[in-house]
């Protein structure tokens, strides 16, 4: 069993659950998300990781299956539970009531059984204002207090009330259990970052996501059900609460249970203010900057005039109140909708497990799938696993995570960092302090960060977006946990795939996580073989460089301080150099002519390397903002039963070799807290 304490969040990949996980993480809790993904997506979990900068453990489990749930409780020290999982559509529940009763109630029974057998005593339950039914049938019950008699009118609400009763009965039998029952009203909005939000599958059941889909062009018009109610504009009044406020309410309830053990109590979560349907329509139109069509139709069965919450109990006891109004919710929802018009479901994107089946932290995500330019990326090392051009793979790649973790892997496609290339004797000085890294037994230096290398680390994410039909982006993030370097780095790797231009752009951005200064030099280590489908090596390909001037190096491949012409390779002004079985042998650092600085992204993306193959009728051009680029002809690439030497050629843009020990270049690789390291590179493929 793990030693760390965890908060288990069932249904944590869903709308309200995901926003609550973010609040929990930001408050210092470690979370495990359990979800069967029947009406949600794992992509929300990947996005939560980047949003919080933390690993969020995930298990795909159906609560109706007791055995895997029980094993999860065996494997982790679970301290508390937030229970969101369940079917939740009111209308659907009237069509398939038995499914709702089985899923929601049996799943909760299993959860409570596991809690009881593992001595887990705290649970925050996601109930609903639907347990009240039509509160207007009573006098003086609007706004609705927790003392209002219950009377749900649909199977969904009845399952919620039944679960509440189960918890009250369990608490009556064992006062060591603590239950916070949260009855909330109408959640709206999205996280202000636009990274997570509501992603309804099919036709939205709720007003705001339906309006958003009309505004973005996915649906023709909005339907308003009735305008003859006794309200200011004739439409029903509801209590709309920003989902971030709602998530913070769950955090407040959990803290209450931690403070007052043995509690079993209900709290309304709402704003206490009513908004009509047309008032909400106008607020949303103000947020998006234009009006869209709506049509008034007949009243909907079961709708009542006013369902507004009385929230005094939550304000007084949980010390919680809403801070975000409906206008802010509309603004945040529109940002989410614009950034993610189809939610988490993105055309041209596919993901598969890369490690053990069911390990969602290790996936390969394909961008541009179904086009003539597809890029496959892995969490491990934020690695470029494959680039497929016109249906053919053009890079050296391996089959799975195990092969990439093997010591024989020559960093194929990996993000190399936190410090690429060589550091002499594995030592350097920052702010008067001498740093010593674990050196290589072969030459006594450190290459590609040695034991600290990113290529074997699991990156969080990715956040995948599709801003244009032919463009996809994927953001990966890694925050150093333990490192021999003097400070931890938080590194963002952003891939951008343009299937029309057949270009892959990579952007790196690093900041110190905390205090101090450290070395930073991050790049990619992809090996190209444009004729891979016909030829096992790069024999027959042709290469050119922007300049064949490079750093002179000693027998340990460390710079002497002089520049040298490497005439065995052609420049852009010459006829390209043809690669044979043995010549040329390249493992040199060439200069691009671009300035060396801490963040080079303001420099122009400059072509520095071209590789072509006439048989494949293909060329790749590497462009960079960096001052140097290392070129390897792969003479020591020998992966048993997979690849032989010269299986690919690598162009690795970066800073000067051993810059951290050179006064002239040191400022370009020493990153202090509060400043930013960055650079860009691109791979563009063209048909000859």
UniProtKB/Swiss-Prot annotation:
Keyword Oxidoreductase recorded = no
* Pfam families xref list: Aldose_epim (PF01263), Epimerase (PF01370)
Which reaction equation describes what this protein catalyses? UDP-alpha-D-glucose = UDP-alpha-D-galactose; alpha-D-glucose = beta-D-glucose
EC category: isomerase
Cofactor dependency: NAD(+)
Q: Its Gene Ontology molecular function terms?
A: aldose 1-epimerase activity; carbohydrate binding; UDP-glucose 4-epimerase activity
Query: Induced by what?
Result: By galactose.
- Catalytic positions? 525 (for mutarotase activity)
Pathway where it operates: Carbohydrate metabolism; galactose metabolism; Carbohydrate metabolism; hexose metabolism
InterPro entries documented for this protein? Ald1_epimerase_CS, Aldose_1/G6P_1-epimerase, Epimerase_deHydtase, Gal_mutarotase_sf_dom, Galactose_mutarotase-like, GH-type_carb-bd, NAD(P)-bd_dom_sf, UDP_G4E
Matching CDD domains: galactose_mutarotase_like, UDP_G4E_1_SDR_e
The record's Gene Ontology biological-process terms are: galactose metabolic process
Q: Name one GO cellular component term.
A: cytosol
Which UniProt keywords are present, listed alphabetically? Carbohydrate metabolism, Galactose metabolism, Isomerase, Multifunctional enzyme, NAD
The Swiss-Prot or TrEMBL record describes its family as follows: In the N-terminal section; belongs to the NAD(P)-dependent epimerase/dehydratase family. In the C-terminal section; belongs to the aldose epimerase family.
Q: What is this protein called?
A: Bifunctional protein GAL10
């Amino acid at each position: 069993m793990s030693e760390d304490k965890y908060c288990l969040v069932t249904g944590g990949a869903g709308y309200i659950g995901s926003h609550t996980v973010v609040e929990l993480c930001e408050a210092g809790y470690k979370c495990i998300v359990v979800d069967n993904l029947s009406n949600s997506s794992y992509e929300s979990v990947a996005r939560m990781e980047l949003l919080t900068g933390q690993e969020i453990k995930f298990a795909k489990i159906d609560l109706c299956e007791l055995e895997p749930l029980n094993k999860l409780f065996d494997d982790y020290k679970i301290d508390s539970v937030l229970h969101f999982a369940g079917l939740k559509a009111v209308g659907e529940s009237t069509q398939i009531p038995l499914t709702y009763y089985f899923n929601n109630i049996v799943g909760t029974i299993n959860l409570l059984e596991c809690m009881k057998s593992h001595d887990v005593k705290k649970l925050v339950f996601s109930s609903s204002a639907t347990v009240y039914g039509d509160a207007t049938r009573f006098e003086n019950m609007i706004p609705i207090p927790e003392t209002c008699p219950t009377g749900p009118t649909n199977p969904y609400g009845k399952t919620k009330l039944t679960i509440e009763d189960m918890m009250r009965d369990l608490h009556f039998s064992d006062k060591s259990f603590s239950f916070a029952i949260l009855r909330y009203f109408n959640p709206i909005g999205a996280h202000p970052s636009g990274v997570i939000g509501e992603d309804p599958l099919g036709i939205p059941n709720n007003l705001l996501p339906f309006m958003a889909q009309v505004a973005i062009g996915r649906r023709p018009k909005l339907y308003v059900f009735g305008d003859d109610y006794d309200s200011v504009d004739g439409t029903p009044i509801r209590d709309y609460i920003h989902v971030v406020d709602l998530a913070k309410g769950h955090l407040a309830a959990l803290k209450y249970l931690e403070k007052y053990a043995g509690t079993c109590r209900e709290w309304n979560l709402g704003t206490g203010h009513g908004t009509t349907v047309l008032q909400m329509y106008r607020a949303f139109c103000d947020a998006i900057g234009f009006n869209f069509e709506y049509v008034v139709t007949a009243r909907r069965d079961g709708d009542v005039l006013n369902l507004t919450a009385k929230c005094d109990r939550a304000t007084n006891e949980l010390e919680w109140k809403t801070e975000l109004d409906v206008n802010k919710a509309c603004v945040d929802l529109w940002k989410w909708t614009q950034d993610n018009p189809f939610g988490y479901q993105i055309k041209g994107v596919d993901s598969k497990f890369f490690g053990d089946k069911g390990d969602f932290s290790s996936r390969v995500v394909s961008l541009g799938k179904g086009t003539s330019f597809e890029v496959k990326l892995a969490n491990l090392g934020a690695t470029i696993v494959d680039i497929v051009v016109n249906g053919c793979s053009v890079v050296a790649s391996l089959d799975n995570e195990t092969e990439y973790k093997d010591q024989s892997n020559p960093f194929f496609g990996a993000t190399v960092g936190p410090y690429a290339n060589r550091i002499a004797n594995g030592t350097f000085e920052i702010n008067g302090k001498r740093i010593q890294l674990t050196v290589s037994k072969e030459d006594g230096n450190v290459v590609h960060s040695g034991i600290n290398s990113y290529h074997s680390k699991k990156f969080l994410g990715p956040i995948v977006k599709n801003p244009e039909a032919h463009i996809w982006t994927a953001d990966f993030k890694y925050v150093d946990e333990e490192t021999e370097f003097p400070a931890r780095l938080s590194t963002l790797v952003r891939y951008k795939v343009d299937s029309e231009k057949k270009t892959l752009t990579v952007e790196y951005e690093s900041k110190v996580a905390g205090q101090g200064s450290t070395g930073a030099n991050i790049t990619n280590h992809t090996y190209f073989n444009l004729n891979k489908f016909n030829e096992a090596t790069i024999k027959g390909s042709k290469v050119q460089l922007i300049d064949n001037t490079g750093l002179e190096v000693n027998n340990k491949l460390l710079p002497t301080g002089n520049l040298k012409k490497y005439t065995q390779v052609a420049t852009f002004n010459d006829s390209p150099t043809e690669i044979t079985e043995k010549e040329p042998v390249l493992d040199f650092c060439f200069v691009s002519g671009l300035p060396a600085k801490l963040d080079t992204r303001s420099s122009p993306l400059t072509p520095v390397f071209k590789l072509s193959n006439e048989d494949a009728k293909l060329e790749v051009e590497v462009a960079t903002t960096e001052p140097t680029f290392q070129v390897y002809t792969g003479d020591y690439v020998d992966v048993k039963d997979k690849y032989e030497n010269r299986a690919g050629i690598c162009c690795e843009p970066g800073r000067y070799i051993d810059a951290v020990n050179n006064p002239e270049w040191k400022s370009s690789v020493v990153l202090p807290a509060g400043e930013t390291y960055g650079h860009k590179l691109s791979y563009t493929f063209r048909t000859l």
